[in-house]
Amino acid sequence: KNKISKNWVNKQRRDTYVRQSKVDGYRARSAYKLKEIDEKFKIFKGGMSVVDIGAAPGSWSQYVAKVVKSGKIISIDLKEMENIENTLQIQGDFTLVDTQDRIKEYLKKKPDVVMSDMAVNTTGIKNIDSIQTGELCKEAMVFSKDVISEKGFFISKIFMGSTFNEIVALGKKIFKEVKV
């Protein structure tokens, strides 16, 4: 193994959230970022309908499934995922109209939350990664505008980079309120 991968493994072993995710049964540490957002803004409630775009490996969907319990969760990703109780999983490319139509087909009502943790496979060139991931975020926002309930929430991860302000500005055009 090269030095970079050894450093990554060592960092993972020391990471508190990585260790805690194993204890709590989450597939990734990102569940705690969503939990932090939820605790701050009080988003998720029992019975909600949620769409999770870019869901693999599934930690955001796992967190939401625990909170919304009897709600409906649709998880979408290019990658195959292990099943998560109380979720409908769609394996497909979210950027394709066919996949977006399949999501809309499964929705019986407008979702309360659309969340996106989509990111491109990183190149290691931060500006390029930021731009490409920003494009995915914008696509998820535009989709959300058409499907989300009137009092619904859109949650997304975006990289700080050259397109950050542009993405926030688009969010302000689409949604009543934007919090970063």
Give short role names for the model-derived ranges.
Residues 39-45, 107-108, 146-147:
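Glycine-rich helix-loop-beta junction characteristic of Rossmann-like nucleotide cofactor-binding loops
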Residues 46-56:
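Conserved class I S-adenosyl-L-methionine
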Residues 48, 71, 152:
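Glycine-centered, small-residue-biased loops immediately flanking beta-strands
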Residues 57-69:
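Conserved SAM-binding loop of SAM-dependent methyltransferases across substrates and taxa
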Residues 72-77:
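Conserved SAM-binding motif I beta-strand of class I
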Residues 78-123:
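S-adenosyl-L-methionine
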